[in-house]
């Protein structure tokens, strides 16, 4: 980081994480911070074991839990995905979903 306390995502290149899912990733004090974008109709095929906290910048994201159930977070809402419940994300909407995600 060039400016103490600032996380400069603009200096990163997009990384393809899954079909229709890409991310700008930074490591900040040992934690993974990412701007994640899900194209309309995209999702992750595998369940994730890592816990996350996040905020929906635009669009809408649905998280499905291996234990059953789902949550839907819309633009302007935050979410918490615990490490003890496997989960995976989907964008069932017609516009891209853009999120700020911090791994915990």
What residues fall within each predicted segment?
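A short, N-terminal "cap"/entry segment at the start of jelly-roll beta-barrel domains
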Residues: 1-36
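Short loop/turn motifs at secondary-structure junctions and domain boundaries
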Residues: 16, 27, 44-46, 63
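Short acidic-glycine-tyrosine-enriched beta hairpin
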Residues: 67-84
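A short hydrophobic beta-strand segment most commonly corresponding to one strand
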Residues: 80, 94-104
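Conserved short histidine dyad/triad with adjacent acidic residue
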Residues: 29-49, 83
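Short, conserved beta-strand element in jelly-roll/cupin
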Residues: 38, 47-63
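Short, exposed beta-strand-loop hairpins at the edges of beta-sheets
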Residues: 88-92
């Amino acid at each position: 980081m060039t400016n103490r306390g600032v996380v400069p995502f603009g200096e990163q290149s997009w990384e393809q994480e899954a079909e229709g899912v890409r991310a700008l990733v930074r490591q900040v004090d040992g934690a993974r911070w990412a701007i994640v974008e899900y194209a309309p109709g995209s999702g992750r095929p595998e369940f994730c074991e890592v816990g996350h906290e996040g905020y929906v910048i635009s669009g809408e994201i649905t998280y499905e839990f291996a234990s059953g159930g789902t949550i839907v977070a819309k633009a302007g809402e935050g979410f918490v995905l615990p490490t003890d419940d496997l989960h995976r994300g989907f964008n069932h909407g017609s516009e891209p979903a853009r999120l700020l995600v911090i791994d915990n």
